[in-house]
């Protein structure tokens, strides 16, 4: 699996390990990382932007298309 880095766009796919109020599914941007979690900035169910720590297992990288 590719390493998720700061600045990457990710899809929020679950809430298994870290409590967060982000909408699922939704997209968010990674603003910080540590060994088990990523801090993402994205929209919650109420339409307000939140920054939350989310477990790596709860996010899926959104890969950019490669232009040949």
Regions found by a protein language model. Give the residues of each.
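Basic/aromatic-rich interaction segments and small domains that mediate binding to polyanionic partners
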Residues: 3, 9-68
């Amino acid at each position: 699996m590719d390493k998720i880095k700061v600045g990457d766009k990710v899809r929020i796919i679950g809430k298994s390990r870290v409590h967060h109020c982000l909408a699922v599914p939704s997209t968010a941007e990674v603003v910080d990382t540590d060994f088990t979690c990523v801090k993402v900035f994205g929209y919650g169910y109420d339409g307000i932007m939140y920054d939350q720590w989310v477990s790596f297992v709860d996010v899926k990288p959104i890969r950019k298309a490669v232009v040949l």
